[in-house]
């Protein structure tokens, strides 16, 4: 009888653990361009459409590429901001300006309409695993 009880307990635990995989996740890579030129500065913001959740942010690299790891799958809204590297931070004491990640001369502004994922009109559909999504702003 003790063996039967242990077998039943092991089965219940195994079935319970089988459902603990969590929500499927996506990795996303791509390149951001504006009128065909890569953005050298800024961030890409992704927000799952139609559901609760926090936006995730990836930094744009000097060659215009970005990468997200482990974000929710499904229909996704996108925002893009291009931070001006020439902006001087207000510093205190002996603090120094951090060096830019790319030549500040490569920076150019983009329309502010792209900054909010909910209003930008930019979207993609993500599936579990690796995804590629280039963002071409006009």
Give a label for each model feature.
Residues 63-69:
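Short, surface-exposed beta-strand/beta-hairpin micro-motifs centered on an aromatic residue
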Residues 42-57:
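Short amphipathic beta-strand segments in non-cytosolic proteins
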Residues 1-18:
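Sec-dependent bacterial lipoprotein signal peptides
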Residues 74-84:
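A short, solvent-exposed beta-strand micro-motif common in secreted/extracellular proteins
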Residues 29-39:
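Structural motif
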Residues 97-138:
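Extracellular beta-sheet/turn segments enriched in Thr/Pro/Gly and aliphatic residues
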Residues 20-24:
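Bacterial signal peptide processing site
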Residues 84-91:
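Short acidic/polar inter-strand loop motif in beta-rich domains
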